[in-house]
Amino acid sequence: ADATASGSSALDTLMGAKIIAPDGGGDDAVRSSVQTYYGETLQTSDDLKTSACCTPYDLPKRIRGILSNVPDEVKAKYYGCGSPTPQGIDGLRVLDLGSGSGRDCYVAAALVGESGRVTGVDMTDAQLDVAKKHAESYCVETLGYDSPNVEFKKGTIEDLAAAGVEDESVDLIISNCVVNLSPDKPAVLSEAWRVLSSGGEFYFSDVYCDRRLPDEIRSHPGLLGECLGGAM
């Protein structure tokens, strides 16, 4: 289906019921709630109140090896729910939607090699600070590259153009337990469609539900932050 058809009922159904903004606000109130949760309420994955994020799963041997060299601070502030980064992506241009502390970007930086490029987009300053803090040392000292092949940009995943992501500029998009947090999920898919090059692919891990969520869950700031309030 054409992901630009953001108003289609089929796409809206796929994306689940719309998040109810805390305190009756709009989309900006939802984003503000998410920023507060991931920038202030959570300091490490130990602070999570549910198992929706960071559900145990087996990782490929190569990914485990790469993760062993990722800085501890980056891993401590990881709140994903899977491993959306495929292997065999040498030389590709990768975009991570809602990159957080950068864990998956660091993994991708190793997988694409020095000729590849990885960009992470996130809206939370506290997470971006951690991601940027270790990028150069990780790429140059740990991976042995001449210069970093990963960068992080501030922006929302519903408006990648504002973050400077151009049309058909990436070969692979990844996203780890983030689309559920968006107040406008059709816009996320529309932007993904726009920035992917011809033949590009979108890999994501996220939270789904098998029934309609009650308003009490869709409007609860804590459950939104824990990836339940916006489950698809």
PLM features: residue spans?
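N-terminal auxiliary segments of SAM/dcSAM-dependent transferases
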Residues: 3-57
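Conserved alpha-helix/loop element of class I SAM-dependent methyltransferases that forms part
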Residues: 53-93, 104-111
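Class I SAM-dependent methyltransferase SAM/SAH-binding core
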Residues: 89-97, 101-160
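Helix-to-beta-strand junctions that scaffold the AdoMet/dcAdoMet cofactor pocket
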Residues: 113, 182-183, 196-197
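A short acidic, Gly/Pro-enriched loop at the edge of an enzyme's catalytic core
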Residues: 159-172
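A short SAM/SAH-binding and catalytic strip from SAM-dependent methyltransferases
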Residues: 171-184
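A short glycine-rich, Lys/Arg-flanked "PGG" loop and its adjoining helix->strand segment in the class I
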Residues: 186-201
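Short, glycine-/aromatic-enriched active-site segment of Class I SAM-dependent methyltransferases
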Residues: 207-229
